[in-house]
Amino acid sequence: MAKWGEGDPRWIVEERADATNVNNWHWTERDASNWSTDKLKTLFLAVQVQNEEGKCEVTEVSKLDGEASINNRKGKLIFFYEWSVKLNWTGTSKSGVQYKGHVEIPNLSDENSVDEVEISVSLAKDEPDTNLVALMKEEGVKLLREAMGIYISTLKTEFTQGMILPTMNGESVDPVGQPALKTEERKAKPAPSKTQARPVGVKIPTCKITLKETFLTSPEELYRVFTTQELVQAFTHAPATLEADRGGKFHMVDGNVSGEFTDLVPEKHIVMKWRFKSWPEGHFATITLTFIDKNGETELCMEGRGIPAPEEERTRQGWQRYYFEGIKQTFGYGARLF
């Protein structure tokens, strides 16, 4: 997918008589099985919980069967992973008595969300009953799901590098349908005075846009996509920096998009000052993202206020394509593959 503010890499193929797979535009596949094995073992073996009854920890990954891969089809990433896992855990009571048990995870796959993955916790044969089983089933299972979520997120970021490359020579060009201003017009725009305070931006004609989109994931997961640096880099296919706190800054898409978070309520809404670098200096729009739970799906409502009037359609199309479709293509949150 082309970056916001750049040309589409697919067209480089037209310049070659041999139709070489430039920028991996045609079908490519990357095997992530070995990496996944190491990553899952590291994450699972870090699981440890404790309460007034004692503590429990995963001590061994006794079985890890499966595979993982990433496919790039015409610039769109498709993730596949399927694992059957067995773990051994040890519990130690406050009195120092040790207990051993097992965990089975038969269906860690791309067909199930993390919350849908089955996790079975049990004591080893001939072990006496202990309240530590309840600790492992409740708090231990929560940490196991967190570990699986981290695995899935990192799989979708670390292995995308190089599968969709930037435009030729790394040069940024204006999007189609957005002609650059003539030199005379750019010169005619006076630069804002550095001594003049601009708390609310420059005065220009503005407009409001609203968009709605449904994602096949939970509000919690979709919120993470917008507030986790690695996930933002994954769906934009470009470097990004962000601090997901009130007052935290963000820079995305090689600096083409920047702003500041002004309010964040996990799983509920995000409010931010947002600008595209071609906008008049000092001007920010206010973007509000509202996450609505729709029985396992999420309806995302985007409202943008203060959009420069000449940029209305470009901004609308940019959010639809580079945010919404980009997220669906990268993480599989769409009803269909784009």
From Swiss-Prot:
Q: What turns on expression?
A: By heat shock and treatment with the HSP90 inhibitor 17-demethoxygeldanamycin (17AAG).
Q: Where is this cross-link: Glycyl lysine isopeptide (Lys-Gly) (interchain with G-Cter in SUMO1)?
A: 182
User: Where in or outside the cell?
Assistant: Cytoplasm, Cytosol; Endoplasmic reticulum
Could you tell me which residues carry Phosphoserine?
Answer: 193, 258
Recorded hits in SMART domains, A to Z, give:
Aha1_N
List modified residues, type Phosphotyrosine: 223
Enumerate the SUPFAM superfamilies for this protein. Answer: Activator of Hsp90 ATPase, Aha1, Bet v1-like
Q: Which GO terms describe its cellular component?
A: cytosol; endoplasmic reticulum; extracellular exosome
Q: Where is this cross-link: Glycyl lysine isopeptide (Lys-Gly) (interchain with G-Cter in SUMO2)?
A: 203
Regarding tissue, the record states:
Expressed in numerous tissues, including brain, heart, skeletal muscle and kidney and, at lower levels, liver and placenta.
Q: What is the effect of changing residue 223 to E?
A: Phosphomimetic mutant. Increases the binding to HSP90AA1 resulting in TSC1 dissociation from HSP90AA1
Q: Give the quaternary structure.
A: Interacts with HSPCA/HSP90. Interacts (phosphorylated on Tyr-223) with HSP90AA1; the interaction activates HSP90AA1 ATPase activity. Interacts with HSP90AB1. Interacts with GCH1. Interacts with SRPK1. Interacts with FLCN. (Microbial infection) Interacts with vesicular stomatitis virus glycoprotein (VSV G) (via cytoplasmic tail).
Described purpose of this protein according to its UniProt entry: Acts as a co-chaperone of HSP90AA1. Activates the ATPase activity of HSP90AA1 leading to increase in its chaperone activity. Competes with the inhibitory co-chaperone FNIP1 for binding to HSP90AA1, thereby providing a reciprocal regulatory mechanism for chaperoning of client proteins. Competes with the inhibitory co-chaperone TSC1 for binding to HSP90AA1, thereby providing a reciprocal regulatory mechanism for chaperoning of client proteins.
Q: What is this protein called?
A: Activator of 90 kDa heat shock protein ATPase homolog 1
Q: Whose protein is this, by species?
A: Homo sapiens
Q: Provide the gene name from the record.
A: AHSA1
